[in-house]
């Protein structure tokens, strides 16, 4: 993230006490699944700091629970990189790959499925362990929304019609930023489930949307130089400049104000949760699960994203340019 762009996040920084162990071993899983096959790929992946991201997203997780979070973060960004080239401008190829990956939500994959799909299948299998059928169905819906968002992005690029409305762009990016599947894993990592009636409440819905919007704003600021280097036009900064005729500086300031306003609303919504719990007559155990989700899921995905974006090497312009030379990325997504 550009060092002169700051955001006030009113939550303390947290990171799993098991972070160092997880970081030391974080390349083992993608290597074992064939997702990283060269030293250059390993070095590039390490620069992203995905173990750090997982340790901040799931600050109470340790051992195998944290490892699952680390593997999910590794998978997320390997998958996302597959769409930085021609595939990301071809809706048919994008749908072909996202369908191949999403098939893991329905059952075992054929051996011919691309490596990135087998990687997702492994993460999904472990994610579902110990979770109820209702939770698995809810999380699967979130994943399908995430995959469909990539097709929408590809259509925009293919038609060479970049978004000219921040509102329309937000609606699309709320899917592809991947916050909801990320927060779902917080329930799995703490071995708890938010009662569905609370999850469906207007208060929690609004809190999750704020968490999502904050993440995508932080991400667009952090990736600004990277996306500019590769000619990407669908970034909130560029969209605000086109939509309003603003300068880059004013667009960034508007995004900073947007985060501040949203987080003020978030704190007000948090204060409403005890009333929500009372309204739905939650048991002591259900209240504990909901509070774990708030602290170790929703709050941590906001603060953790901010801390990670400020330190990750993923968003340097040279990282983006180097991606075009990583031939292994095409192999990961090959559906031939």
UniProtKB/Swiss-Prot annotation:
Protein name: Pentalenene synthase
GO biological process: antibiotic biosynthetic process; lactone biosynthetic process
UniProt-annotated binding residues for Mg(2+) 3: 219, 223, 227
Sample GO molecular function, one term: pentalenene synthase activity
Taxonomic lineage of the native organism: Bacteria, Bacillati, Actinomycetota, Actinomycetes, Kitasatosporales
Binding site for Mg(2+) 2: 80, 84
Any matching Pfam family: Terpene_syn_C_2
UniProt KW Cell cycle keyword: no
Cofactors, names only: Mg(2+)
UniProt family annotation: Belongs to the terpene synthase family.
Keyword Lipid biosynthesis: no
Listed pathway(s): Antibiotic biosynthesis; neopentalenolactone biosynthesis
Top-rank taxon, per record: Bacteria
Annotated cofactor note: Binds 3 Mg(2+) ions per subunit.
Keyword set, alphabetical order: Antibiotic biosynthesis, Lyase, Magnesium, Metal-binding
Positions occupied by motif DDXXD motif: 80-84
Subunit composition and interactions: Monomer.
Its EC number(s): 4.2.3.7
Annotated catalysed reactions: (2E,6E)-farnesyl diphosphate = pentalenene + diphosphate
InterPro entries: Isoprenoid_synthase_dom_sf, PentlnSyn, Terpene_cyclase-like_2
Binding site for Mg(2+) 1: 80, 84
């Amino acid at each position: 993230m550009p060092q002169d762009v700051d955001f006030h996040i009113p939550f303390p920084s947290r990171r799993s006490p098991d972070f160092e162990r997880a970081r030391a071993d974080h390349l083992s899983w993608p290597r074992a699944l064939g997702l990283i096959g060269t030293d250059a790929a390993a070095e590039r992946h390490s620069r992203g700091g995905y173990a750090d991201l997982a340790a901040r997203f799931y600050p109470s997780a340790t051992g195998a629970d944290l490892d699952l979070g680390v593997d999910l973060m590794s998978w997320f960004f390997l998958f996302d990189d597959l769409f930085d080239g021609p595939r990301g401008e071809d809706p048919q190829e994008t749908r072909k790959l996202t369908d191949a990956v999403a098939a893991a939500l329905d059952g075992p994959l054929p051996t011919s499925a691309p490596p990135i799909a087998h990687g997702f299948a492994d993460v999904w299998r472990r994610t579902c362990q110990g979770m109820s059928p209702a939770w698995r169905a809810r999380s699967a819906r979130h994943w399908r929304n995430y995959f469909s968002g990539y097709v929408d992005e590809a259509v925009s690029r293919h038609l060479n019609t970049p978004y000219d409305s921040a509102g329309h762009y937000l609606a699309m990016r709320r899917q592809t930023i991947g916050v909801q599947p990320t927060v779902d894993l917080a329930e799995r990592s703490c071995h708890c489930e938010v009662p569905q009636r609370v999850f469906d409440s207007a208060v929690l819905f609004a809190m999750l949307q704020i968490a999502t919007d904050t993440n995508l704003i932080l991400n667009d600021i952090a990736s600004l130089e990277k996306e500019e280097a590769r000619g990407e036009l669908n970034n909130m900064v560029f969209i605000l400049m086109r939509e309003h005729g603003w300068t880059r500086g004013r667009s960034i300031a508007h995004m900073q104000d947007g985060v501040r306003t949203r987080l003020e609303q978030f704190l007000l919504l948090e204060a409403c949760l005890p009333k929500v719990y009372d309204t739905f007559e939650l048991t002591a155990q259900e209240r504990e699960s909901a509070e774990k989700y708030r602290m170790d899921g929703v709050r941590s995905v906001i603060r953790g994203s901010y801390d990670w974006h400020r330190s990750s090497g993923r968003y340097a312009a040279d990282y983006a340019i180097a991606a075009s030379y990583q031939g292994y990325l095409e192999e990961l997504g090959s559906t031939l």
